[in-house]
Amino acid sequence: MNSKMLKHLRLATLSFSMFFGIVSSPAVYALGAGNPAAPVLPGVNPEQTGWCAFQLCNSYDLFAALAGSLKFGFYGDYVFSESAHITNVPVITSVTTSGTGTTPTITSTTKNVDFDLNNSSISSSCVFATIALQETSPAAIPLLDIAFTARVGGLKQYYRLPLNAYRDFTSNPLNAESEVTDGLIEVQSDYGIVWGLSLQKVLWKDGVSFVGVSADYRHGSSPINYIIVYNKANPEIYFDATDGNLSYKEWSASIGISTYLNDYVLPYASVSIGNTSRKAPSDSFTELEKQFTNFKFKIRKITNFDRVNFCFGTTCCISNNFYYSVEGRWGYQRAINITSGLQF
């Protein structure tokens, strides 16, 4: 079998294997996975000894088989929409009073309700630095081929969700305003600081194909630009403001496979699992509560659904010192990730 046909066969096997793994996963979700071969890119590894070469290192001198590199570049992650919600919001379904006098007994019945986000988007642009340790031996299962990455940059957030998700219905059950409404809350932040850490490891390689894993953590805090509260039935719009920040936390772990399509292009596919959460400042609706004394709010955490998220991307190694990757992901997030870097 010639080398060109072998590369196409590996690419077909890659696509089928990742698709099967994706559809059989019950609850997977996360941020961009990145190319599984990232620790050894953009340089080309030496040819390995074969698919079944179960060799760890062929040198008695471990350091003679190692090489290192330093990478700097740009990392952009842009989420256009996501499936997220606020869960277990207690809503008053009925109120009864008993007893006489000035302090009757009030009994209320509540029901926990989940509220989904109507719209959301996240924009993150960072610079990164990576320290990579590559193994130059022909081992199929390398001891190292590992990369550590630190990122810092800006994060901007936007979301809109039902007003009832932030309502405090239980503070005064007798108030008519405690009934469920059809209002909406819209929150947008300015750019704030975000930082992230990443660890990537190649598990297996044969000189053309790679299997790797990664773990990522991202933490951001963005100052609030505006908060809008309005009701669909009544054309009333209220603006609120806060000096606090909109927090954002996300972690993920992924496994993926990549292969050389030609000497410069490596398509890849990955599956990842993780969690995302964000929370508005506790004083987000202070001014609105002053205007309406019977209108109470409670800030709750926004979390994602348990749904499948899968990533497909391509890395282009233009030279031995420069590369870029474009990745799209679908599932709980609909997003695009762009990474480019220089190796020294």
Curated annotation (Swiss-Prot):
N-terminal signal peptide: 1-30
Localization annotation: Cell outer membrane
Keywords tagged on the record: Cell outer membrane, Ion transport, Membrane, Porin, Signal, Transmembrane, Transmembrane beta strand, Transport
Ranges annotated as spanning the membrane: none
Gene Ontology CC annotation, any one: symbiont-containing vacuole
GO molecular function annotations of the record: porin activity
GO terms, biological process: monoatomic ion transport
Source organism superkingdom: Bacteria
Topology with respect to the bilayer: Multi-pass membrane protein
Family label: Belongs to the chlamydial OMP family.
Protein name in the entry: Outer membrane protein B
Originating organism: Chlamydia pneumoniae
Gene (UniProt): ompB
